[in-house]
Every structure is written in C-alpha cells, then in structure tokens.
C-alpha cells in the first residue's frame, strides 16, 4: 500500500463502485445506507487497494514529463530488457495473492491505516 493513512470519502467510494460495475445503493445512497447495520455508505471490500490511486507519490502512478514504463508500452505491457532474449528473467512478476482482514465495514468518514507485511514468495520450477 502506498500510503500510511487514507481518509475514506463518499465520492471515492461511489466512483470505485461504479468502476467495478456494482450498483448496490449502500455504496452511494446515504438515505438507503442509514437504514442498514453499518449506518452509512460503506466501501466495497476491494476498495482498500484503490487508495494508492489517490497518492501522488505512488510508484506505479504515471509521472508528468517521465516516460511511462507500464502496460501498453509493448504488446504484452512489458518492455523487454536489452539483450534479455525470450527466456526467464525478461518477463514481469505475477501477483499471486493478497490477504485482507476486516474487523468492521469501511464507512465513509473513516481513516484507513495500512500495515504491510512480507508474505511467502516462490518461483515456478
């Protein structure tokens, strides 16, 4: 996660829910959400990963005046290393797993605090 603390805003929740195609009114309708157990607009479970998109220093965010290194730069989205050939080591990494522990719903107005812990790593044989 790119930021240590991230305030959760109702507008960000609504835009995120729209972007994933989830029209559940608990993600945008304050009047509807007041009648639910959480008592307010809540964020979809995967919203926590979206906080990086609002951090101007996030390392994967495009930077003005700097060449883009990410997807669509090449046919696969991976720019080959010079002299890298086609074998192992010239490809990109694979994000295999994430784990989240939720203690309560994330409600608009909350502040999200992230803790990053290294997980297991492995290589394909």
Show where each model-derived region lies.
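Hot-dog-fold acyl-thioester-processing enzymes
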Residues: 1-95
């Amino acid at each position: 996660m790119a930021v240590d603390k991230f305030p959760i805003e109702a507008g960000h929740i609504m835009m995120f829910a729209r972007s994933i195609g989830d029209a559940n009114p608990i993600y945008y309708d304050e009047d509807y959400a007041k009648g639910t157990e959480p008592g307010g607009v809540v964020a979809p479970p995967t919203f926590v990963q979206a906080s990086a998109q609002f951090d101007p220093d996030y390392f994967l965010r495009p930077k003005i005046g700097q060449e883009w290194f990410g997807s669509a730069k090449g046919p696969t989205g991976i720019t080959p290393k010079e002299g890298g050939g086609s074998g192992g080591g010239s490809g990109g990494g694979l994000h295999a797993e994430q784990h989240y522990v939720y203690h309560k719903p994330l409600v608009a107005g909350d502040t999200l605090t992230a803790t990053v812990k290294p997980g297991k790593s492995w290589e394909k044989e």
